[in-house]
Design a protein with these regions (language model features):
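Short N-terminal targeting/anchoring amphipathic segment
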Residues: 1-7
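Active-site-proximal region of nucleotide-activated glycan assembly enzymes
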Residues: 16-93, 250-258
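Conserved catalytic-core segment of nucleotide-activated headgroup transferases in glycan assembly
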Residues: 79-176
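Short, conserved active-site loop motifs that form the nucleotide-linked donor/cofactor pocket
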Residues: 152, 184-186, 238
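Flexible loop/turn segments at secondary-structure boundaries
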Residues: 7-12, 33-36, 121-125, 161-166, ...
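Donor nucleotide-activated moiety binding/catalytic core segment of transferases
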Residues: 129-130, 166-215
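Long, C-terminal catalytic modules of enzymes
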Residues: 102-105, 109, 149, 237, ...
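A donor-sugar binding/catalytic signature common to diverse glycosyltransferases
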Residues: 10-12, 29, 192-239
């Protein structure tokens, strides 16, 4: 059986029925690149299980040419552009510089945590729980944590892709988390003209559920806390708590001295190497 996606709606039903009947199932989904797909055997492709390819490739030297390809792709994404056969983009707002964005948001010199959301109900969020019941619950508890920490700042970047959907917005989840957002919490909505990569430049730590922005934060040297099950966690360049207790401990430790917890050169290089494998070799 060949099934697209294998996670959502009737596609998920087809996948699970075939698996329960012992029928081999191939799942696929269209990747970020034109004329290429992601492909999995007997698993949901949107799990993006890269363990096998990463284990096979991680000890092969990462060449300068490969890094240049990742850099070219990354710079295109930073500017809100497509690159070669990579045709998908989630934002078109050009960069204006981290300093200008910080001033516009009213940020000061207190440490900044950047929380980047996924789109609720997207295949990349379904069944990805580690210690929270849902992504929305994790966001709510994170907002409540920072509401009690006036010594630090939280910027929440709601996924720009929400403008293409009709479901609940993470804007509503954030606003319902506390009675009134305190001055140290700043909400950037999906339609707000703010470049996410300017926010990465401002940030001291990153907080993500499963979004690929977490990988890009690590490529920039930020310590990244991953709350959900995503393909790039567990590879030595992210913090991966297994409970809320662990999560709060990691947050407190990183926020106490974020600059001392920036990734070292080996970890940054590893993140870049992984990005090459994921963006250029994982799709077929």
């Amino acid at each position: 059986v060949v099934v697209q996606n294998g996670t959502i709606q009737k596609l998920g039903v087809n996948y699970r029925v075939a698996m329960n009947l012992g029928i081999p199932v191939s799942t696929y989904e269209f990747s970020d690149q034109k004329d290429r797909i992601w492909l999995a055997q007997n698993s949901e492709i949107m799990r993006q299980d890269t363990n096998a390819i990463w284990e096979a490739r991680k000890d092969i030297p990462f060449t300068d040419d490969q890094r240049e390809k990742v850099e070219a792709l990354y710079q295109a994404k930073v500017q809100g552009n497509t690159w070669k056969n990579f045709v998908r983009k989630w934002q078109s707002t050009p960069r204006e510089g981290g300093g200008d964005v910080a001033n516009r948001l009213g940020l000061d010199d207190r440490p900044v945590a950047l929380l980047a959301t996924n789109v609720l109900g997207d295949s990349l969020t379904l069944g990805r729980q580690v210690f929270s019941e849902t992504m929305a619950e994790w966001i709510e508890k994170t907002v409540q944590f920072f509401a009690q920490r006036s010594d630090v700042q939280l910027v929440i970047r709601v996924h720009p892709g929400e403008v293409l959907t009709h479901g609940p917005s993470m804007v509503d989840v954030v606003n319902k988390s506390v009675a009134n957002l305190p001055e140290n919490i700043h909400l950037v909505g999906p339609r707000d003209q703010v470049n996410t990569y300017d926010l990465i430049d401002i940030a001291d730590i990153g907080l993500v559920y499963t979004t690929t922005t977490g990988l890009e934060m690590a490529m920039s040297g930020l310590p990244v806390v991953v709350a959900g099950i995503t393909h790039y966690k567990g590879n030595g360049f992210t913090h991966d708590p297994q409970s809320y207790e662990d999560y709060y401990k990691v947050l407190n430790r990183l926020l106490q001295d974020p600059k001392n917890h920036r990734l070292n050169k080996r970890q940054i290089d590893q993140a870049w190497h992984y990005a090459y494998i994921f963006f250029f070799e994982y799709a077929v």
